[in-house]
């Protein structure tokens, strides 16, 4: 939806004549496209799926869900990075903990702080997914439920490191010290 929003904006300023009478494209901006991404992130991902996993991890057998939890943190960091790159300052404080804000008027977190949170999420996940930190007990097997990497922890760690590099490149001109952490 982000790409569609930007395409509509660019198309509005471009000249496109189809050659047919009354067939010129319309580039009317529809709030639903932008709102869809926002709603999907906060309603579907943050408050239902991610929140449920966080609660399961903290109140059930941590060893059993260890791998699934930290893989999900990596994926959530990826979604969160796209959200802040699209909207800038966003509400994060409660959602990243898997909680609902106490009222509807949530506090927006400045984008610089969101990036700090992203680096913390990724650093923690990378550390916890190293072989020596994995619990000795049998893990919840993601297997076919992991559509990206089939539950391969090494591939998820590589993705997390790649995402860290991408985020570091994004902030390198604004905050070189943060980029080098």
Predicted regions located by residue number:
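Aromatic-residue-lined binding/catalytic grooves and analogous aromatic/hydrophobic interfacial grooves
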Residues: 4, 119-142, 153-181
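Short acidic-aromatic linear motifs embedded in glycine-rich loops, typified by GG[WY][YF]DAGD(H)
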Residues: 1-117, 121-122, 132-135, 181
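Carbohydrate-binding/catalytic loop surfaces
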Residues: 100-101, 142-152
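Short, well-structured alpha-helical patches and their helix-loop capping segments
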Residues: 110, 114, 152-157
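Flexible, solvent-exposed coil segments and beta strand-coil junctions
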Residues: 30-33, 138-147
